[in-house]
C-alpha cells in the first residue's frame, strides 16, 4: 500500500472541505443576492403600480445598504461570539420574511397613510438590517477553515453565486412575472417577492442541520484531517495580529481596503440593480427575453471571474490581477453607455464590466484575511464590507437621479 505525499493528502482534505462547504454556502449566497436585487425586475412594473419615480426607486434600492452598514459589525461580532451555525440561520430566516413582505408595500402604505415610496424605503432599510452580517459572516467562517493563501479560490467560487443568481434567477423572475400576474389577486411583482423569499427561509432552517461551528464540531472529518487543518491555521496565525476594535479602526490599511471596496461596489451594484432596465431601453420588450439576456450576461461573467481568479492564484499574483480587472471593468461600463442603441454591444460591455468587478472583488477579499485574525478579522471584514457597501447606496441612487434628469 502506497502512502500519499503530504501535499497530496493536504489537497484531498481541502478538496473535501470545499465540496462540503462551498456548494451549500454558495446556494445560500445565491438566494441572498437574488432577494437583494430582484427588485430590479420588480421595478419594471412596480413603479407604475405604486406611482414611484426612478429617483425614488434608486434611493430605495440603495437604502438597503444603509441598514446593512449600521448593523454589519455588530452582526459579525455576534457571529464570532455565538457561533456561525445559529447566527447565519437567524440572518437567512429574518431576511426571507422581510423580503416577502415587500409584496405588500402598497397595502402597508394604505394601512399607515404613508406614501408607497416611504414604505418602500423602510422595507429596503429593514432588509439591509436583516441581511447585515451574512456575507462577511460567511467570509469569517471560511477563515475558520482556510489559510489566507487558499481563500481567494474559495471566495471566487462563493462570489460566482452573484452572477449565477441572475443566471438562474433572471429567467425565473421573468417567468414568474409573465405567468403569475393577476393570480389570486396579486400583481406580477408581488408574486416575484413572495415566491423568491421562500428559499431563504427553507435554507436558513437547513443551516442548523448542515453547518457546524468549526473544525472540531465536524463529524464528517477524520481526526487526522482535523489536525491537519488546525495545524495549517496555527502556522499562519503566527504572522497575523488580533487587533482590538479601537486599534483596528485607527489602522490605515483598513481604510485603504474600505475605499477600494466602496469603489468596486458602486460599479457592481450600479449594474445589478439596473441591468434589466438597461436591456429594456435598448428595445427588448418581452420580460422573458430580458430575463434570458440578463442570464447570459451573468453566466459569462461568472465563468470569466472563476477562470481569472484561478489564474491569479496559480501565479500567486493577486494585486495586479485585481487592479487590472477593476480598470477594465470600469472602462467597459463607460463604453456600454456609448453604445446604448445596440442591445448586444451594450450587453457585451456590461458583461465585461461585471466580470471585472467580480474578479477584483474575489481577489480583494484574500488581502484583509492575510493580516488579521480572531476578533480582529471578524470586525475588520465587517467594517470593510459595511462601509464599502455604501457604494451600493450611492451607485443605484446616482443612476436613478441621472435617469430622471436625462
Where are these regions (language model features)?
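Extracytoplasmic gate region of multi-pass secondary transporters
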Residues: 39-40, 246-305, 361, 365, ...
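Primarily marks hydrophobic transmembrane alpha-helices of the MFS/SLC 12-helix fold
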Residues: 88, 120, 321-322
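Interfacial helix-cap and linker-helix signal at transmembrane-aqueous boundaries
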Residues: 46-47, 78-79, 172-184, 279-280, ...
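Glycine-rich segments within core transmembrane alpha-helices of 12-TM secondary carriers
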Residues: 153-181, 199-200, 385-395
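Helix-to-loop junctions at the C-terminal end of transmembrane segments
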Residues: 71-84, 303-317, 403-404
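C-terminal ends and interior cores of transmembrane alpha-helices
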Residues: 93-114, 327-341
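Cytoplasmic helix-loop-helix junction between adjacent transmembrane helices
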Residues: 123-160
